[in-house]
Regions:
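Flanking scaffold residues of small Cys/His-coordinated metal-binding clusters
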Residues: 31-39, 70-74, 149-152, 167-171
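Cys/His-coordinated zinc-binding microdomains
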Residues: 40-48, 80-83, 161, 177
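Amphipathic, Lys/Arg-enriched alpha-helical patches that create a basic surface
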Residues: 293-298, 312-348
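A broadly conserved sequence feature marking short terminus-proximal activation segments
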Residues: 1-54, 92-150
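Charged alpha-helical initiation segments
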Residues: 140-217
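Short Cys/His-rich "knuckle" micro-motifs
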Residues: 47-54, 83-91, 165-172, 183-187
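Cysteine-rich micro-motifs
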Residues: 65-82, 169-180
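Flexible secondary-structure boundary motifs
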Residues: 135-137, 238-319
Length: 348
């Protein structure tokens, strides 16, 4: 079999000999061209993220880098763990590559013997008393293909330009390791502004009730984002600073609850970290935050009808009437929250 070649595998050969090849088989990729990565930290949640192409900008701010883009090493965007690239291999990808190699080798061997049989049969004399025929059943099995799905949140690091995908929110760029919390928040603002634009378009069709509901959803999203980003930051910092047995108690559902929907209760939690991210706000901005958080409660839990508590506390509206939701106020609210998110990122 000196003329035999593993034709399907040789195209992935990067070293070794013909009989003992070193292969580099590409990882399965998603429709957008990203590959699965899996955080090696067993305590990380949700662990799975996707890594795309590198697009290093012309002007690279090296002061923001943890690691030179494109070099050895990966950072988990969720928990911040740093490890070699191979440590982030997705087990399903390894199995998919093994399955492909087995299929390719089997097909190459089968193709060789099918050709050998054809050559042998053609070489046999015709018309004799005895005829010999070699019969090899061809292998028509399909090439195994692994399906990889893109996650909902796909963006690029604002520092090194690396594209990646996560579940809704992350803290770091997996390539350069730079802080990326504000990059995700910018995407949240984009989505909120799109809702505001949609509400204005609907209003032009004289469907004021639907327009009002869409604005209400946009307003609620700002508060939801405000709460969620604080939770993610807080859990990361607690795990970073405190021992595991202590941190697990400090970040469980009962210990956090909905405290990040209330500025005073959130401040009490931040005292455990000796931090006050709200210090970047003016008194007027703090009042704006409190107003909008109270308004969100009315929008989300009372069909936007002001109750006595809201009317008395905020000195706005009459009980039983709908609260006012304005596009410019939502935008101002989002920009105020952004100041807090930027401060959280600096404190990481």
């Amino acid at each position: 079999m000196s003329e035999f070649h593993f034709k399907r595998l040789e195209k992935y050969k990067v070293g070794g000999t013909r009989d003992k090849m070193e292969l580099k088989v590409p990882l399965p990729h998603s429709p957008s061209g990203k590959v699965y990565r899996w955080c090696p930290n067993v305590d990380c949640t949700p662990r799975l993220f996707l890594l795309g192409d590198a697009q290093i900008p012309e002007k690279l701010d090296i002061s923001q880098l943890k690691r030179t883009p494109g070099t050895q090493g990966t950072t988990c965007p969720y928990c911040g763990m740093d490890a070699d690239d191979d440590e982030f291999n997705y087990l399903g990808d390894i199995k998919a590559i093994q399955k492909y190699i087995e299929w390719a080798a089997s097909r190459d061997v089968n193709d060789y013997f099918v050709k050998m049989a054809k050559d042998f049969n053609r070489s046999q004399p015709r018309g004799g008393l005895i005829s010999i025929k070699m019969d090899i059943k061809p292998d028509y099995s399909q090439e195994p293909r692994a399906w990889r799905e893109d996650l909902i949140r796909n963006l690029a690091c604002n520092i090194c330009g690396r594209k990646y995908g996560v579940y809704a929110i992350a803290l770091f760029c997996p390539d350069c390791g730079g802080k990326n919390l504000h990059v995700h928040f910018e995407r949240e603002i984009e989505l909120i502004l799109q809702q505001i634009d949609l509400a204005e378009q609907v209003a032009e069709t004289n469907n004021s009730e639907l327009s009002y509901r869409i604005l209400g959803n946009a307003h609620e999203d700002v508060v939801t984002v405000f709460e969620t980003y604080q939770k993610v930051f807080y859990r990361y910092m607690i795990k970073k600073i405190f021992p595991k047995d202590q941190s697990e108690k400090m970040i469980d559902k009962g210990a956090i609850g909905n405290r990040f929907q209330n500025l005073d209760r959130a401040k009490d939690l931040y005292k455990k970290l000796s931090l006050d991210p709200f210090s970047v706000l003016t008194l007027e901005e703090l009042d704006l935050m409190k107003l909008n958080i109270e308004k969100r409660h009315v929008i989300g839990h009372n069909l936007s009808l002001a109750d006595e508590s809201y009317a008395d506390t905020m000195s706005r509206g009459k009980p039983g009437t709908t609260v006012e939701i304005l596009a410019e106020e939502i935008s101002e609210f989002a920009e105020t929250v952004k100041k807090i998110i930027m401060e959280l990122e600096q404190l990481m």
